[in-house]
């Protein structure tokens, strides 16, 4: 299980990529680039054919990965390959619950341990149904990451009391995707979560530029960035796949990712 021990001036930068997008070997290089860009941890998404929480950018990434033959087992194994190839930040598997159910639970957790996967995030599993999975995570030393969206304070307290690693604070209702601005009600909500939580609070769903990062960093411990990075991968995909242009495209991706991280001011 991992703990994110932050220095007072340090902020979380937790990027999301889809395992196998655009191709598995490039996913490994993208993870290394994100680590160099200052990522605190990595969310590794499992491609799924019916991604309820995801907007069009991540849906297209899922399709590209599924076209490569990716599934939950291969995604976990890809996480293991990342660890073997120099990725030493925590890797959190982001998966819908159905692919987990289709595997034997014992086999699923054995795979996570064998491949040194540090955390698990299941976006479509409500609090009431997550207790047994949280217990399994504890017994296998995998950190279960809790998602919180605007809800009653008593429910918030219940979710946050059980939180480990960090609390993933959902900035907008609806699906993932780049947003130009957020509803003003999100800011008091994030402050409430921050006041209740004893673990770091990261804000995600829609973070797409440096200005939003600065704003969210003022009231939280950092950000989760998904669609903006996945869209950049989509834009660079042909150059990432080609051996001749890959290094240059990876550098471009790393420079882009750095704008979301604490390393930005060091450039």
Curated annotation (Swiss-Prot):
Transmembrane segments: none annotated. GO terms for cellular component: cytosol. Disulfide bonds: none annotated. GO terms for molecular function: tryptophan synthase activity. The active site is at 43 (proton acceptor), 54 (proton acceptor). Its EC number is 4.2.1.20. It catalyses: (1S,2R)-1-C-(indol-3-yl)glycerol 3-phosphate + L-serine = D-glyceraldehyde 3-phosphate + L-tryptophan + H2O. Keywords: Amino-acid biosynthesis, Aromatic amino acid biosynthesis, Lyase, Tryptophan biosynthesis. It is an enzyme of class 4 (lyase). Pathway: Amino-acid biosynthesis; L-tryptophan biosynthesis; L-tryptophan from chorismate: step 5/5. It comes from the Bacteria. Belongs to the TrpA family. PANTHER family: TRYPTOPHAN SYNTHASE ALPHA CHAIN, CHLOROPLASTIC, TRYPTOPHAN SYNTHASE, ALPHA CHAIN. HAMAP family: Trp_synth_alpha. The alpha subunit is responsible for the aldol cleavage of indoleglycerol phosphate to indole and glyceraldehyde 3-phosphate. Tetramer of two alpha and two beta chains. This is Tryptophan synthase alpha chain. It comes from Bacillus subtilis subsp. natto.
